[in-house]
Amino acid sequence: MASLNSSNEIKSYQFKQMAFNKTTGGKKAKKIGVFCKPKAPSATDILGRLIPWLRKQNYHVFLDEGTAAIINETSSHEKKEIFQQADLLIALGGDGTLLSVARVAHPHNIPILAVNLGSLGFLAEISIDELYPTLENILAGKFEIENRMLLNACIWRNGEKVEDHNVLNDVVINKGAVARVINLQVLVNGQYMTSYRADGLIIATPTGSTAYSLSAGGPIIHPSMHTLVLSPICPFTLTNRSILIPDQSVIQVKLAAEYDDVRVTLDGQEGYDMRAGDILEIKKTKTSLQLIRGPNKNYYQVLRNKLHWGTQNDEDIL
């Protein structure tokens, strides 16, 4: 289990206990779980080439039901079984595909290779053209892991925990389309911080700082930083700005009054009702996500490419 102080470190990674080398004779083949966005461009062609290629390398491939259906495979596995068995996960799609896999896979400490099939892809930074050279390096044990922080979010209602989930990007509290400004009381480590009157509040990891939080005026945070960011959405008080707090903090957000429609959204994919008096408690998980880095890429290169920042010729750079 990763320590609380090492959740974002970049490190070289070798499959030690897994001995992720080709097997021969009667030895058991190593196991790779593959997940693909069903409506991704060219998903059928990509899987139709990838799966036979992996099997030819003598690796056992696990497909979930949705992925198997894309290429009409009759054999599929439950996601729980894949996470328990696999030595490596491949997520084909975009950031959304990775987020859905990561929330469940991270306690199992399985490295994930995220491949971008056409979307923005801050996290899924590996292109389809880079897939096979990257896989060859991975299967030879030559790659780097970037550990990404996750958050645990619980909703407490009348002293009882009614929801308990993990997120990679962010936890968002927001009002419905016709609801008025909501009042959110925020405590950090049991100490009262402030009350927000706003359309909502975003609590994001460094990974999530380039998602919804960025649109709300929050800062971009390097993944190695041990911090969380709280960003109010359209606050009534203009001095209510984004604030960074240590990642070992425990954040409690209380919905101070009754509103018609207030939701807690996790990574933009799952939503739950929040009622008057409910307390949303957020803290860092003990385990982190093991994300395989793209070849010859760094964080600033990804920012330049995805945010269309200005570039210079190599000879002009100091």
What are the residue ranges of the model-derived segments?
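Catalytic core of DAGKc-family lipid kinases
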Residues: L120-D199
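Short glycine/serine/threonine-rich phosphate/pyrophosphate-binding segments
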Residues: A43-T44, G96-V101, T210-L214
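ATP/nucleoside-binding phosphotransfer catalytic cores, i.e., glycine-rich phosphate-binding loops
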Residues: I173, N189-Y192, L238-L318
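ATP/NTP phosphate-donor binding region
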Residues: A2-L4, N8-L88, D129-E144, I155-H165, ...
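Redox-cofactor binding/interface segments in oxidoreductases and associated redox assembly factors
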Residues: V34, A91, I203
